[in-house]
Amino acid sequence: MAVPGAVTSLELDGVAAGHGVLLPGDNLQRMAELPAASFQLAYLDPPFNTGERQTGGHARAVRVGDGDAAGRPGFQGRAYTLTAGPQSSYGDRFDDYRAFLLPRLEAAWRLLHPTGTLYLHLDYREAHYAKVWMDELVGRDRFLNEIIWAYDFGGRTRRRWPPKHQTILVYVKDLRAYYFDSDEVDREPYMAPGLVGPEKAARGKLPTDVWWHTIVATSGRERTGYPTQKPVGILRRIVTASSRPGDWVLDPFAGSGTTGAAAAELGRRFALIDENPEAVAVMRRRLGEALQPEA
């Protein structure tokens, strides 16, 4: 019997490229409603198990009068103040993180197409454990990459090396058949362009497994106000490399909807899942007409 409100394969077929569905609710239940092998790409950005409640917001920069001591210096020496907007939050503490994450990895893997790729985004707290769990779940021979997203922004401790990176583990359904489009991926400048010749230097190089990309600025235009928002540039690269226009992209921890924003921009179809009403509200505002009416 079909689950009420389920997205069936027929409904998936009826979604146009550049559009998608938003599925509020528990991602384990919602993924069980979706047809197997339907998604070319699955991107999972679960809570990192930091032990804290994650809170985010959006700050708007407002210019103040010249010489105002209350302002902070900004572009061209002008003074600005930051006005805080509404805040969103979610819990990020688990007594048994493996029991939480493993069933969701298994559910996402079931939905992956035979040529598909799964990206699992974590940080130093759980990434190494998750690698072992994924190897046990799908096999070490399906591991493709460990991507390091490096950035240089935010607070710094003086008692250890400041953590300024996150880890993205990449697994494929079949190492002989997975889809990867290196030609369409954004390219990076060579570190020593004089060694490669002018034509290659002008074209740039395929990114390695270390990605330098700034975080989403508190007062930036991209900022939605939802905590731990990922930059659209990171998702744009993932979606471009591991899916084609018209393919389905899954994000079961959708949060601020960055995966949907990148997928819509690139002409992919997407399914976003989140049980946090604040995340659902943010995604409805952010994605607007790119969302199909909910079932």
Where in the sequence are the language-model features?
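Core catalytic lobe of class I
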Residues: 1-293
